[in-house]
């Protein structure tokens, strides 16, 4: 039988920076960020148009994989210092390089295949922000880090500049100790959010969030309350992470070459994005997580920045 230690060793060999395990046999959903918190968040309509967040399978891991016994949570540090020349537009740091779904997904696929070669009868599913799974909860419970007041997972080693994935398996594995919270009395992220999207510690209202509106919303126009406070952001927003003391102190450049600041979007001007054609969109977003933002939304976002709060 393959051990938890052997799994972690192999996962680290694949390049994952953090690996932890949750033993579902002993897991109890009584922590602040669990199912009850998700239900309260949904009841308040804080998911906006993200209907998939209400998928009932998200509230029970065994509905995702019948017979699930363990969750292997993994993380990759994606932090990159500001590139030179400086970007012409503000884009969330996670999207500066290649699509993280593919970068983590390839590694998780290999991990799953290796596990099955060790234990052929076991079953598994892996996800990278792609299924009805509470990624952050499992990362916290696996000891990867803790869910910060800005709702991102913070690790002692890398701050919150980490991308998460998980492999759910029917294997019975020894779990790790859940991570304790180290936000303390700090409220810098709440104070810094220009739209007040962090309505209380650990609770983000997507309806007020710049990242949500610039990436997920398909509305023809951004709400006035969002457009007036974009502060240059055309795709995502890192404000709450940039002010976090853990990030300011512990951020370190990633060794993952795929996360290097290579996206041509970084050197595309607001004026170009404001008139972006479908053909140019196809070229600029190829291989990027920001392909999720369609050409009409890029034009909408850039036009809103230009008309409200230009970023030079």
UniProtKB/Swiss-Prot annotation:
Name of the molecule in the record: Epoxyqueuosine reductase
Cofactor: cob(II)alamin; [4Fe-4S] cluster
Origin organism lineage: Bacteria, Bacillati, Cyanobacteriota, Cyanophyceae, Acaryochloridales
Catalytic activity entry: epoxyqueuosine(34) in tRNA + AH2 = queuosine(34) in tRNA + A + H2O
Boundaries of every 4Fe-4S ferredoxin-type domain copy: 176-203
Membership in a protein family: Belongs to the QueG family.
Stored Pfam families: Fer4_16, QueG_DUF1730
Alphabetized NCBIfam families for the sequence: tRNA epoxyqueuosine(34) reductase QueG
GO-annotated cellular components: cytoplasm
Pathway(s) where this gene product acts: tRNA modification; tRNA-queuosine biosynthesis
Natural source organism: Thermosynechococcus vestitus (strain NIES-2133 / IAM M-273 / BP-1)
Purpose: Catalyzes the conversion of epoxyqueuosine (oQ) to queuosine (Q), which is a hypermodified base found in the wobble positions of tRNA(Asp), tRNA(Asn), tRNA(His) and tRNA(Tyr).
Binding-site residues, [4Fe-4S] cluster 2: 193, 209, 237, 240
GO molecular function: 4 iron, 4 sulfur cluster binding; epoxyqueuosine reductase activity; metal ion binding
Any single GO BP term: tRNA modification
Source organism superkingdom: Bacteria
Gene responsible for this protein: queG
Enzyme Commission code(s) on record: 1.17.99.6
